[in-house]
């Protein structure tokens, strides 16, 4: 019986070489070699792994196992373990490793034994929690089903949507726990609580006048519907908007809760939470993106030879996995085809395509400029004429005037991406790059549209004439301007949700019915619509940016966004399965996931700008809100610091001073440059090692060719066989 396995027959040249002493064998004097050298040999590990089928191997190698076991179990002077060779790296069976572990425990001290036991218990508990959380993951089965039917690119969109649902839910928990709940409890005197309201000092009386247009007396039903859509009327005086939180402090028995400070710190908290979570997920996806893009040939090998999960026992799961691998291979082949096409372009073709791209980008800039100007004019018209419509009590006209900015923004968000999607077909990019470029262009449309809207509002809120000097803002048009901004964000969020539902019900499903039951050539040429990943991603990134900006002005906006995205998931899933078709050009999920998060991070960074301006520069409303006694919302921070002890005040002011900030910035830059240089050095070392591996593999192939030629020419293969056997069994530590 051979040590290569039961019933395995060795080739004749190996048997002949063994009889002549030209072949390395475990039963020879080499067994006395050091254990470390023998354990590096792949033949040694293979033989031990198969010792259950080859009983004579255990006897031949028993002395070597004894040496290794003795070295492993040898007690140390401090009573600890011998940590030179980790137990899991030894080529022993589970029973032998367990015996070795028990021997280590026998010689270990009580402290080491407790530390080992607690560490194992903690790791096991973490593993169980991780497995349980994976089974309890939201929409786990639905997303796996989508991945199998439509590929990993579309699956990445639904995973991204799930992430936003969880993020908004955590934002809602923060705002509700630290802002809404204390305000409601103190206003209603629950749990022996009370609230304190201090009238603003050194403020003109007319600046403190705020009479919300709440519904009083008998009103028509459509009035409630209008208020529900616009955030005015009965909604304006609820916990949904900034104006409700007109509290300076909440008292719970003898404990004072500083609501203005909590309001500001919670705003910073949800922004920091979003930033850290997005960065964490971006790093994970970027690492996977680098691995997938490192070597396409290696990716093919991994998918073909190691892509299948042999733990799958369900037939449906097997079909989904099969389709997922098929889409991934199609994506790789499509990328290789495009790379080959780009490499074969002539100079004339390159000049043509570059000229066409420049012309298309000029058209894109013109479309963007038209969108921005339309939004600015619509916002100014809406703010100037909404009060006129209210006085005339014309319900439809008032609703249209108030929703005019939202209608124009949504129209621009719908028309501009359609133009960009049509133009990008002529630019001849890859499927993945088409999505990225379309996303970037649509980001400028959607997010810049929100910026133009806010700029239009602030240009009217913060005016420079004599009317605004007394209060710092236009108190006649905006007595509580924070609630007005919150209402605009609320209308954008609601209107965007209504458009998504309307497009699914009145465009996607009728198109599906026409294509299915109408045999006209024009209808069949029109066909089913593909699931546009870039458009759908921009929809939710646009809504999330609105939520980040509007949460400061409407603390419960994350709850609305959570419900909105939860419903959108099922709407998009039903639309995808019943009315859409898979993309004709598959895309890679790893690059999509990373780029989606990168665009979302851009939206978050852009949200910092209007929030920073509102908190630090624009005067806070004197008639409503927790900051009515301060010039700006940020003024609560230095006011709170003045209540600290003198030593702590000096320390905080020292940290905020330029004397500390400049050296800290320089040191941070030095550390950043150091880690960048270190990463570059590691990358160069990895490239050198990869080149070395490729060179060694070529050398070995060259040697094999030479040995084959020597065998054919000499007719005496014994010497070649000797060289071959010694080369095959040399240590692989160089590789």
Swiss-Prot record:
GO CC annotation, single: plasma membrane
Give the record's GO biological process terms.
sensory perception of mechanical stimulus
Where would you find the membrane-spanning parts of this chain? 165-185, 234-254, 259-279, 356-376, 404-424, 437-457, 489-509, 549-569, 595-615, 635-655, 659-679
Instruction: Give one Pfam family.
Output: TMC
Coiled-coil residue spans: none
Enumerate the UniProt keywords alphabetically: Glycoprotein, Membrane, Transmembrane, Transmembrane helix
Cytoplasmic-side positions:
186-233, 280-355, 425-436, 510-548, 616-634, 680-735
Q: What does this protein do?
A: Probable component of an ion channel.
* Family assignment from sequence similarity: Belongs to the TMC family.
Q: What is this protein called?
A: Transmembrane channel-like protein 7
């Amino acid at each position: 019986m051979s040590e290569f396995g039961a019933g395995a027959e060795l080739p004749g040249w190996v048997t002949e070489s063994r009889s002549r002493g030209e072949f390395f064998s475990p039963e020879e004097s080499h067994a006395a070699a050091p254990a470390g050298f023998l354990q590096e040999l792949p033949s040694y590990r293979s033989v031990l792994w198969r010792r259950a089928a080859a009983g004579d191997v255990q006897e031949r190698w028993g002395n070597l196992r004894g040496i290794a076991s003795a070295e492993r179990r040898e007690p140390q002077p401090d009573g600890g373990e011998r940590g030179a060779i980790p137990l899991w790296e030894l080529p022993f069976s589970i029973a032998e490793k367990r015996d070795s572990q028990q021997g280590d425990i026998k010689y270990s001290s009580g402290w080491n034994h407790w530390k080992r036991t607690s560490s194992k218990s903690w790791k096991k508990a973490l593993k169980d929690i991780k497995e349980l959380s994976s089974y309890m993951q939201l929409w786990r089965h639905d997303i796996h089903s989508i991945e199998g039917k439509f590929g990993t690119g579309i699956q990445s969109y639904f995973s991204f949507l799930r992430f936003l649902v969880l993020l908004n839910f955590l934002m809602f928990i923060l705002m509700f726990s630290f802002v809404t709940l204390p305000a409601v409890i103190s206003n209603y005197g629950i749990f022996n609580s009370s609230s304190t309201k201090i009238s603003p000092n050194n403020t003109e009386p007319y600046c403190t006048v705020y009479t919300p247009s709440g519904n009083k007396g008998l009103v028509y039903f459509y009035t409630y519907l209008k208020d529900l859509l616009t955030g005015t009327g009965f909604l304006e005086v609820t916990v949904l908007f900034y104006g409700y939180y007109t509290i300076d402090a909440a008292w719970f028995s003898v404990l004072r809760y500083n609501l203005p400070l909590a309001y500001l710190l919670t705003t910073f908290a949800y922004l920091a939470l979003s930033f850290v979570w997005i960065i964490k997920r971006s790093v994970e996806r970027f690492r996977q993106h680098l691995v997938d893009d490192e070597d396409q040939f290696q990716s093919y090998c991994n998918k073909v030879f190691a892509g299948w999960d042999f733990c799958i026992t369900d037939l449906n799961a097997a079909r989904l996995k099969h389709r997922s691998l098929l889409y991934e291979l199609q994506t790789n082949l499509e990328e290789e085809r495009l790379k080959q096409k780009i490499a074969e372009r002539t100079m004339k073709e390159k000049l043509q395509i570059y000229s066409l791209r420049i012309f298309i980008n000029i058209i894109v800039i013109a479309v963007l400029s038209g969108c921005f100007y339309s939004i600015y004019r619509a916002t100014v018209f809406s703010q100037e004429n909404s009060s006129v419509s209210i006085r005339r009590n014309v319900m439809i006209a008032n609703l249209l005037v108030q929703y005019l900015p939202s209608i124009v923004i949504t129209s621009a968000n719908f028309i501009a991406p359609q133009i960009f999607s049509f133009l990008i077909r002529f630019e001849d990019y890859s499927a993945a790059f088409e999505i990225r470029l379309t996303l970037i262009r649509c980001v400028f449309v959607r997010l810049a549209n929100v910026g133009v809207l806010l700029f239009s509002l602030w240009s009217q809120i913060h005016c420079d004439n004599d009317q605004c000097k007394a209060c710092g803002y236009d108190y006649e048009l905006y007595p509580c301007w924070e609630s007005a901004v919150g209402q605009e964000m609320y209308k954008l969020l609601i209107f965007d949700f209504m458009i998504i539902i309307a497009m699914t019900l009145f465009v996607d499903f009728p198109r599906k019915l026409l294509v299915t039951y109408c045999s006209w050539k024009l209808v069949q040429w029109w066909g089913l619509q593909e699931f546009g990943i870039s458009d759908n991603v921009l929809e939710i990134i646009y809504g999330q940016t609105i939520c980040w900006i509007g949460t400061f002005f409407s603390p419960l906006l994350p709850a609305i966004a959570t419900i909105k995205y939860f419903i959108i998931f099922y709407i998009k899933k039903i639309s995808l399965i019943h009315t859409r078709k898979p993309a004709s050009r598959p895309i890679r999920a790893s690059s999509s996931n990373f780029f989606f998060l990168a665009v979302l991070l851009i939206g978050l960074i852009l949200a910092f700008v209007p929030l920073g301006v509102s908190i630090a520069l624009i005067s806070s409303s004197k008639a409503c809100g927790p900051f009515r006694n301060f010039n700006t919302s940020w003024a609560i921070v230095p006011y709170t610091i003045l209540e600290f002890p003198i030593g702590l005040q000096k320390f905080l002011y020292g940290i905020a001073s330029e004397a500390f900030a400049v050296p800290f910035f320089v040191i941070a830059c030095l550390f950043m440059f150091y880690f960048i240089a270190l990463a570059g050095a590691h990358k160069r070392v990895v490239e050198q090692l990869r080149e070395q591996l490729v060179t060694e593999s070529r050398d070995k192939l060259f040697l094999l060719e030479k040995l084959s030629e020597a065998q054919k020419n000499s007719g005496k293969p014994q010497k070649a066989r000797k060289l071959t056997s010694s080369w095959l069994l040399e240590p692989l530590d160089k590789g």
